Amino acid sequence: MVLSGSDKTNVKGIFSKIGGQAEDYGAEALERMFATFPQTKTYFPHFDVSPGSAQVKAHGKKVAAALVEAANHIDDIATALSKLSDLHAQKLRVDPVNFKLLGQCFLVVVAIHNPSALTPEVHASLDKFLCAVGNVLTAKYR
């Protein structure tokens, strides 16, 4: 997925609004994913997946860090997330559809907390960005 110049500007703009709340957004997105798509819990058998658990918050922090890293290196997401892609493809073997599900949950969280900032254009740009991140994370499955 190719991000245009305006997409990149929109993504960087929304991440600047998220700011120090990215970790909370990551945890909330995971909580939403677990509630909406309970089959995703199977990848976390050792986690307490209840809302607000320390393990969900810790993994939410990792999710947020990866998204921030991708946004900070938006011109080369593949290199920025290469190690994470290797981990998910070779060790964790997460079903690729789960990246799309988590991306949609993250988009919902951003919309809830930033309704005025998430214009249709920003929404489309963020969706394209999250799809690009998902594509990078699943590229090494092939």
Curated annotation (Swiss-Prot):
It holds the Pfam family Globin. O2 binds at H59. Red blood cells. Keywords: Heme, Iron, Metal-binding, Oxygen transport, Transport. It comes from the Eukaryota. This is Hemoglobin subunit alpha-A. GO terms for molecular function: haptoglobin binding; heme binding; iron ion binding; organic acid binding; oxygen binding; oxygen carrier activity; peroxidase activity. The gene is HBAA. Heterotetramer of two alpha chains and two beta chains. It comes from Ara ararauna (Blue-and-yellow macaw). CDD domains: Hb-alpha-like (cd08927). The keyword Heme applies. Heme b binds at H88. GO terms for cellular component: blood microparticle; haptoglobin-hemoglobin complex; hemoglobin complex.
